[in-house]
């Protein structure tokens, strides 16, 4: 289960709406399973159908996470025209060529903008190509 403070879910939805019609992406970091920082990451694809995180952003974020002794807890992105469920592309991007997970402990948070007046947000694990929905508790 992932527990997420309301202001983080609000920020994810706001980010998605601001980037619409393109997908947004970002990272949640923290300690002991508790999110303490949300990082918006530039989607270098500038696409409504896919995202790729800017490598320069990732270098800065990874350094700050290491310096703060945090963990990468979740990766988030939006789906602008489909449900909040990992696509085949999302699964492929979450795995190495040998099929093993790149971040097996990380949650993947997806926000769907199919209904922009009421976006849907869900959390998943993607482990070795298998998707499992996880409870997302907003506090």
Regions found by a protein language model. Give the residues of each.
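Histidine-centered divalent metal-coordination motifs
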Residues: 77-81
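Conserved beta-strand-loop surface patch within small alpha/beta domains used
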Residues: 1-72, 83-139
